[in-house]
């Protein structure tokens, strides 16, 4: 089952860009080198200059477990701590269904419409 990780890390607003620049090569390496990595991003919050947003998408639990002991993860974690990032609130979610936000008629849908179509 796919896993999403979503959260935020607090950082001094004056240091946020430097923190992101410091981890950028490691984020890139994670995307390129780690099997099962479907998305991996640390990005500036568009409203709060003191927040970094974390979004990860992993193929399954085993690929996420491998990531947590991979040198890229350990180096990223160390760089974040060395640069004085603050509190983080990061959670993982199991994905049981995935589908587009818009249907075939380009309407935005909050419901999981492909499941409803499969049941009819």
Model-inferred region functions:
Residues 14, 18, 49, 75:
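Residues that form or flank phosphate/diphosphate-binding pockets in enzymes
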Residues 42-50, 76-120:
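Glycine-rich beta-strand-turn "strand-cap" elements at beta-sheet edges
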Residues 25-37, 57-92:
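An amphipathic, aromatic/His-enriched active-site/gating alpha helix that lines ligand/cofactor pockets
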Residues 3-10, 41-70:
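Short, well-ordered beta-strand segments in beta-rich or mixed alpha/beta enzyme
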Residues 11-13, 60, 94-97:
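Non-catalytic surface loops within mature trypsin-like serine protease
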Residues 3-42:
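N-terminal first-folded block
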Residues 16-18, 63, 99:
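Intrinsically disordered, low-complexity acidic/polar segments
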């Amino acid at each position: 089952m796919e896993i999403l990780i979503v959260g935020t890390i607090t950082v001094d607003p004056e240091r946020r860009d430097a923190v992101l620049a410091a981890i950028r090569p490691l984020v890139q390496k994670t995307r390129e080198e780690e099997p099962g990595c479907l998305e991996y991003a640390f990005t500036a919050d568009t409203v709060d200059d003191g927040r970094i947003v974390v979004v990860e998408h992993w193929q399954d639990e085993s690929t996420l477990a491998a990531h947590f002991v991979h040198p890229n993860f350990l180096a990223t974690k160390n760089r974040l701590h060395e640069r004085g990032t603050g509190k983080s609130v990061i959670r993982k979610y199991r994905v049981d269904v995935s589908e587009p936000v818009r249907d075939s008629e380009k309407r935005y849908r909050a419901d999981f419409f492909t499941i409803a179509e499969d049941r009819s």
